[in-house]
Curated annotation (Swiss-Prot):
It comes from the Bacteria. Keywords: Cytoplasm, DNA-binding, NAD, Repressor, Transcription, Transcription regulation. It is found in: Cytoplasm. This is Redox-sensing transcriptional repressor Rex. The lineage of its organism: Bacteria, Bacillati, Bacillota, Clostridia, Eubacteriales. Pfam families: CoA_binding, Put_DNA-bind_N.
Amino acid sequence: MDKKKNISMAVIRRLPKYHRYLEELLKSDVDRISSKELSEKIGFTASQIRQDLNCFGDFGQQGYGYNVKDLSREVDNILGLTKMYNTIIIGAGNIGQAIANYINFQKMGFDLKAIFDINPKLIGLKIQDVEVRDVDNIDGFLQKNKIDIGIICVPSKNAQKVCDIIVKNNVNGIWNFAPVDLMTPENVIVENVHLSESLLTLSCLLQEVNKSRD
């Protein structure tokens, strides 16, 4: 049986961190590393690391550790970084522009094809050589172009409408920055980034720390 088919969501959530640290090790010309050494760098227990990496195959060798290059390549493959995803951004405000300007976007395999907005002052603006288009034209664009991922950076009141349009046009991946839970078919994958919820989580944790000090 292919172990990759049984990777849990918890492991998937940890994969980007493995990717980041393995990239750093490669840049430092590190050829191999033990689970104990990786544990000290990444913050997971050595046992957890061994369990996680066992999902990908038999990469560790007793007395040798992990081959950093091989493991990095496999993590990249699991994360889908060996592919290129056609991507659009809907909403060219502060968050949308920040994402469009992210220098590693293309390197990670996300090819930004278009940006859309409703604001006439933003339409025609170029961000990283990608022109902001009128959102009224998004339907026609999607009918002519195969897009894999839609990045939603619009106010919550407009998010579901935008979601419905891109899903109707066979966009199966959504990165949602709008502070609302979207309704989508089962075959559409939504990754929510609710900034306010993250900030409130931090606030709650700080409050607990402060209580323990009182």
